[in-house]
Amino acid sequence: MLDIKWIRENPEALDAALAKRGAEPQAQSLVALDEKRRSAVQKAQDMLSRRNLASKEIGAAMAQKNGELAEKLKAEVAELKTLLPAIEEEDRQLTAELNDALSRIPNIPFDDVPVGKDEHDNVVTRTVGEKPRWNHTPKEHFEIGEALGYMDFERAAKLSGSRFTVLTGPLARLERALGQFMIDLHTREHGYTEVSSPLMVRAEALFGTGNLPKFEEDLFKTTDDRYLIPTAEVTLTNLVREEILEQEKLPLRFTALTPSFRSEAGSAGRDTRGMLRQHQFWKCELVSITDADSAIAEHERMTACAEEVLKRLGLHFRTMTLCTGDMGFGSRKTYDLEVWLPGQNAFREISSCSVCGDFQARRMNARYRGKDDKTNRFVHTLNGSGTAVGRCLIAVLENYLNEDGSVTIPDVLLPYMGGLTKIERAA
């Protein structure tokens, strides 16, 4: 959430930033609403001050045996007591209205973020590796998995409907191996602390990360008003909600391997075959909590940690800087990692790493105490996928496919596969 004080002082800057995102100007309406709220606050404060002063004057009038003045003051205090609740309620309503309006305003992009409308305006930052060179014809992951006999969409549909998958045997093990490899890499070599956290959260947690109220249609909600997490970013980031941290203990780096749940409400007709766009999928999440001075360097570091997963798997990928029109709601700058899928003859997103500034921290009231001046400031938050396990499985199947239809296990995963070096068709 943005700072209303900053908006009051920089209305043109807000509208210019929104224009870069393709959004309508909001500064005038926000400032007008804030002025109404501040007027109500001032009116309530003036009324309280007058009531308190009148109460003191009653005592003075009584001491001077001025009964007429005392009665007049008592009547004034009684009237103020009657009027005050309505003014305080107006203040509460205007504050809630302003906070709701602010909660729907996206974050301000950094100046170095390319301006653009959609994914076609994203910029290639770097490319790693090369496309595999084969004599055989590439296949899509669902063709490979079904031919091997370990990927079943029909039974998954019987169980749960569309956008679900059943994996069995060595493919189920490969999925587990990928997740274990990622979490081991990030905890053993990249300095992240592993966290096991709930898969269901309250609305307040999703508000903190910016998923609510704007994106409720993308979430699965339980009958007792909890939500299934769309990403472990929600739980990991909210670990510091309503806390004041010591600056010298920053950065905090958390990672978790969890299922993620998404309704894919806006994805009708997109990637309907296979595992690319699922209602339920495993993902290794990375979250950093830091201060303003360290956030940009931490963003580069986090992205490098995610890239290392793909490098060690020997996968060809590119890192994209997202344009203003394709960035997430809470992001100030985002890098997407896109892995090469031979079966699609295309790069597809496998990780997204974002720096959010203090946008989420304001929503969570998460702060740190400066080590020198002891002033409390909002933390800066970052999040990224390190990486999406299902999409990594897709990439391994398509890039390690052999001419006979078998799939070679990448060397880095062999310690997790119980001696299996190749996945072959089920007998």
Swiss-Prot record:
It catalyses: tRNA(Ser) + L-serine + ATP = L-seryl-tRNA(Ser) + AMP + diphosphate + H(+); tRNA(Sec) + L-serine + ATP = L-seryl-tRNA(Sec) + AMP + diphosphate + H(+). Its EC number is 6.1.1.11. GO terms for cellular component: cytoplasm. L-serine binds at T231, A232, E233, E285, S385. Disulfide bonds: none annotated. It is an enzyme of class 6 (ligase). It holds the Pfam family tRNA-synt_2b. GO terms for biological process: selenocysteine biosynthetic process; seryl-tRNA aminoacylation. SUPFAM superfamilies: Class II aaRS and biotin synthetases, tRNA-binding arm. It is found in: Cytoplasm. InterPro entries: aa-tRNA-synt_IIb (IPR002314), aa-tRNA-synth_II (IPR006195), aa-tRNA-synth_II/BPL/LPL (IPR045864), Ser-tRNA-ligase_type_1 (IPR002317), Ser-tRNA-synth_1_N (IPR015866), SerRS_1_N_sf (IPR042103), SerRS_core (IPR033729), tRNA-bd_arm (IPR010978). ATP binds at R262, S263, E264, E349, I350, S351, S352. One of its GO terms (molecular function) is ATP binding. Pathway: Aminoacyl-tRNA biosynthesis; selenocysteinyl-tRNA(Sec) biosynthesis; L-seryl-tRNA(Sec) from L-serine and tRNA(Sec): step 1/1. Keywords: Aminoacyl-tRNA synthetase, ATP-binding, Cytoplasm, Ligase, Nucleotide-binding, Protein biosynthesis. Belongs to the class-II aminoacyl-tRNA synthetase family. Type-1 seryl-tRNA synthetase subfamily. Homodimer. The tRNA molecule binds across the dimer. Consists of two distinct domains, a catalytic core and a N-terminal extension that is involved in tRNA binding. This is Serine--tRNA ligase. It comes from Rhizobium etli (strain CIAT 652). The gene is serS.
